């Protein structure tokens, strides 16, 4: 079956573009900006050398002469992670790759560790798993440890409170990434 541009694809078929957003940055020419002109380019955060080449091309096309200074004025696709306007392209591309691999969970970890990418990466060594809730994690951990809970007491255990106490005591970190979707990390 050949689809013409006017014929919509049947439901359930994958014929459209990948809707996953590639992290990108808007790099502005500071000489133009300081003279009241907006001149810049949206650049995919892929490889630092490619980003720098595109920045050089953008600066060469600037309406101001002899431009060499730039700044990151906007960004998208970083799932809420923050970028400095003078972040190195190595940092930008490394963060983009990390978020590409881990999605919003990666961005949440990056923010949790004060924008330290190495600490966010290291946190995955202490990943305990994905659960419907932190209470489910606390219950599974308790039951898997061999603790016998009599059936008559089972309904009296507040798994939510236990999970909250584990988080407040610094034993675990809990990140919610969706409805009934939490990720637990040990805080060792």
Model-based region annotation:
Residues 2-61:
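N-terminal ordered "arm"
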Residues 3, 8, 76-79, 83-87, ...:
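Non-transmembrane, interaction-prone alpha-helical and coil segments associated with secretion
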Residues 6, 19, 135-188:
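Acidic, proline/glycine-rich low-complexity IDRs
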Residues 23-28, 39-44, 69-73, 171-176, ...:
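Ordered hydrophobic segments in well-structured contexts
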Residues 35, 63-67, 104-107, 146-150, ...:
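Residue-level signal for secondary-structure boundary elements
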Residues 49-118:
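Structured domain cores in non-transmembrane regions
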Residues 109-110, 117-145:
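Phosphate/anion-contacting hairpin/loop surfaces
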């Amino acid at each position: 079956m050949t689809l013409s541009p006017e014929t919509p694809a049947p439901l359930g078929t994958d014929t459209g573009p990948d809707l996953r957003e590639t992290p990108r940055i808007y790099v502005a020419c500071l000489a133009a900006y300081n003279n009241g002109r907006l001149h810049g380019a949206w650049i995919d955060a892929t490889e630092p050398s490619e980003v720098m080449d595109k920045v050089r091309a953008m600066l060469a096309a600037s309406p101001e002469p002899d431009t060499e200074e730039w700044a990151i004025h906007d960004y998208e696709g970083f799932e809420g992670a923050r970028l400095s306007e003078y972040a190195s392209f190595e940092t930008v591309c490394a963060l983009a790759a990390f978020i590409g691999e881990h999605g919003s969970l990666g961005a949440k970890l990056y923010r949790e560790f004060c924008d330290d990418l190495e600490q966010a990466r290291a946190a995955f060594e202490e990943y305990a798993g994905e659960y419907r809730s932190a209470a489910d994690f606390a219950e599974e951990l308790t039951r898997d440890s061999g603790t016998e809970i009599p059936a008559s007491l089972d309904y009296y255990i507040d798994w939510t409170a236990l999970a909250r106490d584990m988080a407040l005591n610094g034993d675990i970190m809990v990140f919610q990434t969706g409805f009934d979707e939490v990720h637990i990390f040990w805080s060792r």
